Amino acid sequence: MARLITVAAAQLGPIQKAEPRGVAVARMVALMERAHRRGVELVVFPELALTTFFPRHYHQDIAEADTWFETSMPSNETAPLFDAAKRYNIGFHLGYAEIAHEADETGTMRRRRFNTAILVSPAGDILLKYRKVHLPGHAEYDPKRKVQHLEKRYFEVGNLGFPVIAAPMGTQAQINMGMMICNDRRWPEAWRVLGLQRVELVMLGYNTPSLNMEAGGFEAHHLRVFHSHLSIQAGCYQNACFGVATAKAGTEDGCELFGHSIIVNPQGEIMAQATSWDDELITADCDLDMCTLGRTTIFAFDKHRRPEAYTRITDQVGAVDPEVWRG
């Protein structure tokens, strides 16, 4: 008998800087209601879903950016999402900016800021938390850039690794579920760490601009979308899992986000894709038994992986020049 779960990518249109959290939460609750009518069991919302993508804005005093962060979850403002989960018997994934009061690597207690995602059960319990590892952009104001990308200024590198949880969801007694956030999707190491935990369903949110604002050169819009999809499709195929990738889309604070949310199967095929720049719900019926073929044949890790040949991946960070041939 098939192990089916109906999932949804709940793409959000733009959230402007002046809009309060309550506006975004109300839109997400409406998407959950729509998902309920379609028989969805798990809804995936984007990265930083409660506010505008604030790392494009520069604050000289980082503490001034704290207005964009959550200090508790659920909070009074996000409680309607948890209530909707219980009302509609739907699990959900939510990306947000987190302030945590916890010890750092030296053991010092302090305020720490992370780009975070959580997985919430239909009962409103937080099943899993993930903090973004691969932070793009820069830490200081760059006058050469029309739009800043200051994730390295406002967030610390995630300290929870890439965890997977085996938990009930929908009608399934157990699903192996993991998360990543935005830029993580471009790093095959992230997918492989999840794959090595037999992940069956990967959830990720993103806020990706249509244009690459780096000074290094121009990247066409169609390539931006292609590279996003390529990363997700390859990750799902090479680790025999489903992926639900949900975007923020449209023109937000004058910056265009390309959207194109997708749901991908373990063969790397796109099962559903968003076509608008607005709030949009795309759904797919995922048979988790489809994960078995890949992980017992081509990607049977226990039979074919050779970690002794991959030590450079963990021993080295930047690229180095190869040995020069002296023929």
Label every PLM stretch briefly:
Residues M1-I15:
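Short beta-strand segments enriched in small/hydrophobic residues
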Residues D83, A100-L230, T297-A300:
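Active-site catalytic loop in hydrolytic enzyme cores
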Residues S72-H93, A173-N176, C182-I282:
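CN hydrolase (nitrilase-like) catalytic-core segments centered on the catalytic cysteine
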Residues T292-G327:
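A short C-terminal boundary segment appended to hydrolase-like catalytic domains
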Residues L12-E33:
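N-terminal phosphate-binding loop and adjacent alpha-helix
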Residues A49-D66, A103-G107:
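Metal-dependent catalytic neighborhoods of phosphoester/phosphodiester hydrolases
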Residues R27-L42, L81-R87:
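A short, N-terminal amphipathic alpha-helix
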Residues T51, I118, K129-P136, I262, ...:
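Short beta->alpha transition motifs characteristic of CBS
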